[in-house]
C-alpha cells in the first residue's frame, strides 16, 4: 500500500494518559514502530513533543475524544501537521488486526493516508467560538431564570404577565422590588406603572391581588439577583466579543448578515464564528447548510430517493439559524415568512423552522 507519510505518529488520548505510536523508516528496511505512554500533565506533553521531534515526525493523528484532545492539539499544532479524526470514521475502516493497539492503528492509517481530517479552525476563531457559546449558555440560563420568576408569581396568584408584556421591564421590575420589600397593596403597586402601562391601572390592580408568602419574596429576590448577575456577564462578554471581532472579520460581514430576515447582530456573530472565513472548504452553499445539520438524509433504493432523518451537524450554528428562522417566520413582508407559515400549517412549526433555517444557511453562505 502506498505510503503518504514516512515519519508519523498516532495518539490514543485518554483523560490521564496518552498512548503514542511513532512510525519511522528502519535502517535495514521496513518500518520501526515504537509505543510509549505519557501522562496528560503539561510537562509530560512537552516530553511527548520532544519524543516525536527526536524522530523527525512530521504528521500526527488522534481521535476527537471529548475535550481531552484540545490541550494536545494546542501544544502540537504549531510544529506538526495534526490530523484530528472522528472516532466513528476510524471504527469503520476495515483491515484492523485484533492485536494492534489503538495508537498503532491510528498511526498506520495516517501513514497510508486513510484518515479523513476534521476541520479545526484557527485559534482566533476557536477563542471566539468559546466566548460566543458561553454567552449563548448565559442567555439561555437567563431565560430559564425569568421563567422561574413567572412560576413564583403564578404560585402567589400574581397575574402581572397577563397585563404587562414584559414582567422585567422598568414598571414590572419596580413592582417586583416592592413585592419583595413586603408591599402587598395592589393599588399602591399599580401606581408604579409607567408609560402606556398606566392605561391599564384597573387591570393591574386586579392582577396584582394575590397571596405572597415569605418564601415567594425570598425566591423572587434570589431570582432577580441571579438575573442581574447574568445580565452583567452577558454585557461584559458581548463587549469582549466585539473587540475580538475587529481583527477576525470586517464589520461589513456582520452588516450583510444582519440584513437577512430573522438575523440580528448576535446571530450574525455566531454564524461568522462557527463558519469562519475559509468558505472555500464548502464546495457549495448547500454543503455549508448540510454541515450545520440542516439537510435531510437521503437514501436511494430501487431507483427511488427517500428522505430520512436530518444528519447531525454543528449544533451551535443550527440553533442560531433555527432561531433566525422563527424570527423570519413572523415577517409579513418577506417570502421566507410566507414559506414558514405555509409549512407550519401543514407540518408544524419545528419542521417549518428547519426548512427556513436551511434556506437561511444557503443564503448566508452565498453572500459571504
Positions of the model-derived regions?
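A detector of single, family-specific signature residues
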Residues: 1-368
